[in-house]
């Protein structure tokens, strides 16, 4: 049983310093000239323990971190796209993460996105509060630990930094994470460590690496144990063409051993495929790369954790994010891969939205967020939006308008689908920031629900009262026409009217004001009203107050579901109308209809 290096991913908003941080960590490792140096992998950099000790100095001892790990394995492709692509069953491939935030700008949209993804995958993380060298008045001490450089700053600069750190603490608290500046953390199990750093000057990097080692020691003892002789398990990071090599696969191996000539199984958009490895390639060390034009060198085998380039036939359609397995039992491996894919793709509903994404990991992330929002999903798949997707969304639209949507993350729309969309009522949400897609979808659904509610509200007969103005009778009957004043609420064409004894006297047939026909009239308005079935001097009289005769089922809907949309005056009138109705039927409005 061997302990592998924990896999570390760097996430954060664009321009907040993800790539600069990775470059600096690599540069520090090379410059430290410690025994062993760094090991360059495809898509990753491994920094061995003796190099970390050289960078961190006494911090490992100060924080009681034992030297039980071989080092740290950094994924070179920063950002949450790589984080979600690099997945394995049950969660993210990364064991730990650095959430990098510009201390001067604070949280930005992609910071929020990254935090949501870390929460979703339950990945332990630290916050690197970057660009402390940009704080006004900061005096740079290249490569020094944060505590040392902080102690050499003016008191005003120290206060500025602490204010900015506590702004991050507040923001993380809003998101449900308790956090503190790393040297003030009292419980590393329940608090997120914030490490102020400069990725450019290297200040704070020793503490950042120390905190990562501490997290690994605390959380990852068991999951870092691997059988180095067992068949390799990994994840596809990218499928790409290399000059002179043809199509190649970049993969991260997180368990076992991978050898040249092994048969490996992976997922394409259609099925599981198997192929035999022709070559395993790793980057040449920098000094060798200067002497040779070749970027890669061949190796016979790699042991986890490892980033490797694989040359093999028939891999053009392999999906990024697909599991990679060495084939020992073909049927068993096939079932294992299919089962893992089905977990994401097939858990769909009879009716719901269509979801398309570029990789398995991003599809999994989008589906999980939609599930948390209780949004049903009809189709969840990988690849560009096709005509078939539009047809599926059209079928879902028949069920409910809010299902007539395609959520497309990081994918294109093929021309035939674009044409089909033009001729349909399907709504397309397309982008590369998951949370923004979700926000846009939610906003669209809210608009539809508001529209539905508005139509529903219009269909519900609401409380209103009118007074028949004396000496303004234009016709006695068929229909009775006279001047009225609206006392409460809004009176509409078609509303039934009753008197204060609860007797129905007629229906509002039409209304006019200065010769203009009206469909409704509001409180304070005086209009000419035609009342069907009413007779002035017999069923209605000048000066009478008439009330809208609300049907009992409408009364319950208003009372139980729409009371928030009524004014206090209208609610009081509802009680008055109920009181009038109960003169004839004491139980009126008391029992909800079943």
UniProtKB/Swiss-Prot annotation:
It comes from the Archaea. Residues 12-19 are annotated as: G1. Keywords: GTP-binding, Initiation factor, Nucleotide-binding, Protein biosynthesis. Residues 37-41 are annotated as: G2. One of its GO terms (molecular function) is GTPase activity. One of its GO terms (cellular component) is cytoplasm. Residues 3-220 form the tr-type G domain. Gene3D superfamilies: P-loop containing nucleotide triphosphate hydrolases, Translation factors, Translation initiation factor IF- 2, domain 3. Residues 198-200 are annotated as: G5. The keyword Ligase does not apply. SUPFAM superfamilies: Initiation factor IF2/eIF5b, domain 3 (SSF52156), P-loop containing nucleoside triphosphate hydrolases (SSF52540), Translation proteins (SSF50447). InterPro entries: EFTu-like_2, EFTU-type, P-loop_NTPase, Small_GTP-bd, T_Tr_GTP-bd_dom, TF_aIF-2_arc, TIF_IF2, TIF_IF2_dom3. GTP binds at residues 12-19, 76-80, 130-133. This is Probable translation initiation factor IF-2. It comes from Methanothermobacter thermautotrophicus (strain ATCC 29096 / DSM 1053 / JCM 10044 / NBRC 100330 / Delta H). The lineage of its organism: Archaea, Methanobacteriati, Methanobacteriota, Methanomada group, Methanobacteria.
């Amino acid at each position: 049983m061997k302990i592998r290096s924990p896999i570390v991913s760097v996430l954060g908003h664009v321009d907040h310093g993800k790539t600069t941080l990775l470059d600096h960590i690599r540069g520090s490792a090379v410059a430290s000239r410690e025994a062993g140096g760094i090991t360059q992998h495809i898509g990753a950099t491994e920094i061995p323990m003796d190099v970390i000790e050289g960078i961190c100095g006494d911090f490992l001892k100060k924080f009681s971190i034992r030297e039980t790990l071989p080092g740290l394995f950094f994924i070179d492709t920063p950002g949450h796209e790589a984080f979600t692509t690099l997945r394995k069953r049950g969660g993210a491939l990364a064991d730990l993460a650095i959430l990098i935030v510009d201390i001067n700008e604070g949280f930005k949209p992609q910071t929020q996105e990254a935090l949501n993804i870390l929460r979703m995958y339950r990945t332990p993380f630290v916050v690197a509060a970057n660009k402390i060298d940009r704080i006004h008045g900061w005096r740079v001490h290249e490569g020094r630990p944060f505590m040392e450089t902080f102690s050499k700053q003016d008191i005003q600069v120290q206060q500025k930094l602490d204010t900015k750190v506590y702004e991050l603490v507040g923001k993380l608290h809003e998101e449900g994470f308790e956090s503190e500046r790393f040297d003030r953390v009292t419980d590393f199990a329940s608090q997120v460590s914030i490490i102020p750093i400069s990725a450019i000057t290297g200040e704070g990097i020793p503490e950042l690496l120390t905190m990562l080692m501490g997290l690994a020691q605390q959380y990852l003892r068991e999951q870092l144990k691997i059988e180095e002789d067992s068949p390799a398990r990994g994840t596809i990071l990218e499928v790409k063409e290399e000059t002179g090599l043809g199509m190649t696969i970049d993969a991260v191996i997180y368990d076992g051993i991978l050898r040249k000539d092994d048969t490996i199984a992976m997922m394409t958009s259609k099925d599981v495929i198997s192929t035999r490895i022709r070559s395993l390639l790793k980057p040449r060390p920098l000094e060798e790369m200067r002497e040779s034009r070749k970027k890669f060198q061949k190796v016979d085998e790699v042991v986890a954790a490892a980033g490797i380039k694989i040359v093999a036939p028939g891999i053009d359609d392999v999906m990024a994010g697909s599991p990679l397995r060495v084939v020992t039992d073909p049927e068993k491996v096939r079932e294992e891969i299919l089962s893992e894919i089905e977990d994401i793709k097939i858990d769909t509903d009879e009716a719901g939205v269509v979801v398309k994404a570029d990789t398995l990991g991003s599809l999994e992330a989008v589906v999980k967020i939609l599930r948390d929002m209780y949004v049903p999903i009809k189709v969840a798949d990988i690849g560009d939006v096709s005509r078939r997707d539009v047809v599926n969304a059209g079928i879902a639209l028949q069920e409910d308008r809010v299902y007539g949507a395609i959520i497309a993350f990081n994918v294109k729309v093929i021309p035939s689908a674009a044409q089909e969309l033009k001729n349909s009522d399907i709504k397309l949400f397309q982008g590369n920031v998951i949370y923004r897609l979700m926000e846009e979808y939610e906003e669209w659904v809210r608009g539809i629900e508001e529209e539905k509610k508005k139509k529903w509200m219009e269909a519900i007969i609401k409380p209103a009262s009118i007074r028949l103005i004396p000496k303004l009778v234009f016709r006695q009957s068929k229909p009775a026409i006279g001047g009225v004043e609206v006392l409460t609420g809004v009176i509409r064409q078609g509303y039934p009217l009753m008197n204060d004894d609860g007797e129905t006297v007629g229906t509002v047939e039409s209304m006019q004001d200065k010769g203009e026909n009206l469909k409704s009239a509001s409180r304070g308005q005086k209009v000419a009203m035609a009342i069907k079935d009413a007779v002035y001097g017999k069923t209605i009289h000048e000066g009478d107050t008439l009330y809208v005769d609300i049907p009992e089922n409408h009364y319950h809907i208003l009372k139980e579901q729409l009371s928030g949309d009524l004014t206090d005056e209208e609610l009081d009138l509802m009680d008055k109308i109920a009181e009038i109705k109960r003169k004839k039927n004491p139980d009126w409005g008391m029992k909800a209809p079943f």
